[in-house]
Design a protein with these regions (language model features):
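Membrane-interfacial helix-loop connectors
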Residues: 73-89, 114-128
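Alpha-helical transmembrane segments and their lipid-water interface positions
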Residues: 17-21, 72-73, 108, 112-113, ...
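Alpha-helical transmembrane segments of multi-pass membrane proteins
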Residues: 49-64, 87-106, 110, 127-133, ...
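Transmembrane alpha-helical segments and their short flanking loops
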Residues: 110-130, 134, 155, 160-163
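Long, contiguous bundles of hydrophobic transmembrane helices that form the permeation core
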Residues: 133-210
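Membrane-embedded alpha-helical segments and adjacent helix-loop junctions characteristic
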Residues: 1-85
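Membrane-interface elements of multi-pass transporters and channels
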Residues: 28-36, 45, 49, 86, ...
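Interfacial loop-to-helix junctions that mark the boundaries of transmembrane helices
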Residues: 4-13, 122-134, 185-191, 210
Length: 210
């Protein structure tokens, strides 16, 4: 029993700061509209095509320092709005959003779960981050290209009405600006991505430095 409590105490001490840090980041994303900025960045990047990738990749990055269940809550309204805008079934959007945030939540520190496992096993955190990202990217890409044709043929599921009230479908889906989520006083994309990626980058660089 003493061994268990000893390991628990040391592990909790190691990851406690990251848990608090993740909660602060999540609150900041919610209050500033950073999630909207990130989604709009990906909409522009893909020129309005493969719209499901915008919230999916946002969740992928968001779940590196933030708990996956919180990332789901932050991404759900955005996913519903985009689905309504382009008349897409939620079966084409929700699975990939969940896939993206689940992969990094489970495989890439400093998310507390994988961070705790890494500490207990004495693994190099920088190496875990590197291989976690490699595995996550490959897994997401394979699943996306394999499952997209399947989900596109599934039963049409409407986005949740409470998220899409007042949202109209876009007639000209080739117009990128028409697909963007309009929200005032949102931070720039770079400022939105920075607090999510910086912890992992700093930990990885610190590990390489050792």
């Amino acid at each position: 029993f003493s061994s268990i409590t000893s390991y628990f105490g040391s592990t909790l001490g190691s990851i406690g700061v990251m848990i608090i840090f993740g909660a602060v980041i999540a609150a900041g994303i919610s209050d500033t509209g950073a999630a909207t900025s990130m989604v709009n960045f990906f909409i522009r990047l893909f020129k309005g095509k493969r719209l499901e990738l915008a919230p999916a990749l946002t969740g992928f990055i968001m779940s590196i320092p933030v708990f996956g269940d919180i990332a789901i809550i932050l991404n759900a309204p955005i996913s519903a709005i985009l689905a309504k805008r382009k008349k897409m079934s939620m079966t084409q959007v929700a699975p990939f959003v969940n896939l993206g945030l689940t992969l990094t939540h489970g495989l890439v520190p400093p998310t507390p779960g994988i961070l705790a496992v890494s500490v207990l096993l004495g693994a190099d955190i920088g190496t875990v981050i590197l291989w976690g990202l490699v595995c996550s990217v490959i897994s997401f890409a394979v699943c996306y290209f394999v499952l997209t044709p399947i989900y596109s043929k599934c039963e049409y599921i409407e986005p949740l009405a409470s998220y899409t009230e007042g949202i109209e479908a876009v007639e000209d889906t080739s117009s990128v600006d028409a697909l963007l989520i309009k929200e005032e006083n949102t931070p720039k994309a770079a400022a939105s991505f920075l607090p999510l990626l910086l912890p992992a980058v700093m930990i990885a660089v610190g590990s390489i430095g050792k």
